[in-house]
Amino acid sequence: MAFLKKSLFLVLLLGLISLSICEEEKRENEVEEEQEDDEQSELRRSLWSKIKEMAATAGKAALNAVTGMVNQGEQ
């Protein structure tokens, strides 16, 4: 009976250690994924800001071109 208790205790102990290691690895993976998501979000924000800047510049250039054509037409 004592042998069974020791064996059961050993199995439970090893199971807890294994579970603990798996949980730690899972947390590390989640942290890495969050960091990657943060980096991707930052890249998206910078990309959108560049697109907005380009659109604003193109809009201003188009407005200036149209204004120039209208002014030439009036003369």
From Swiss-Prot:
InterPro entries: Dermaseptin_dom, Frog_antimicrobial_propeptide, FSAP. Residues 23-43, 74-75 form a propeptide. Disulfide bonds: none annotated. Residues 1-22 form the signal peptide. The keyword Signal applies. Keywords: Amidation, Amphibian defense peptide, Antibiotic, Antimicrobial, Cleavage on pair of basic residues, Secreted, Signal. The modification Glutamine amide is found at residue 72. GO terms for cellular component: extracellular region. It holds the Pfam family FSAP_sig_propep. One of its GO terms (biological process) is defense response to bacterium. It is found in: Secreted. Its main location: secreted. Expressed by the skin glands. Possesses a potent antimicrobial activity against Gram-positive and Gram-negative bacteria. Probably acts by disturbing membrane functions with its amphipathic structure. Belongs to the frog skin active peptide (FSAP) family. Dermaseptin subfamily. This is Dermaseptin-A3. It comes from Agalychnis annae (Blue-sided leaf frog).
